[in-house]
Swiss-Prot record:
Pathway connected to this protein: Secondary metabolite biosynthesis
Main enzyme class: oxidoreductase
E.C. designation(s): 1.-.-.-
Species assigned in the record: Penicillium roqueforti (strain FM164)
Listed name of the protein: Oxidoreductase anuC
Keywords: Oxidoreductase
Taxonomy of the source species: Eukaryota, Fungi, Dikarya, Ascomycota, Pezizomycotina
Molecular function GO labels: oxidoreductase activity
Signal peptide range in chain numbering: none
Length: 91
């Protein structure tokens, strides 16, 4: 695989395939099913096109509230803004 040419302008970067996430849940009958098959809800091109961040999944606490897919709704609606060390990456 070769390095991208020039700054990154889209996600995924030119020449790279989509990252895939597979999240499971339960249907009304209690059977395990796939809830999503995508590449995440939050992508950021950073450092003037030299890097890309892709947040695959995040939660609001521990233990994770998985009832009625509350964790998936939270991850979709709340982009991660702080990481270890409280560095604000996405402003």
């Amino acid at each position: 695989m070769s390095a991208p040419k020039g700054p990154i302008t889209k996600f995924p970067a030119e020449g790279l395939r989509h990252a895939r996430r597979f999240i499971t849940t339960h249907n009304k009958e209690g059977k395990g099913v796939f809830a999503v098959d995508d590449d995440g809800d939050h992508h950021r091109i950073m450092v003037d096109g030299l890097a890309v961040a892709n947040i695959i999944y995040s939660t609001s606490g521990n233990p994770v509230d998985m009832n009625d897919d509350n964790d998936l709704v939270y991850a979709r609606d709340n982009e991660v803004r702080r990481f270890a060390g409280q560095i604000n990456l996405f402003v």
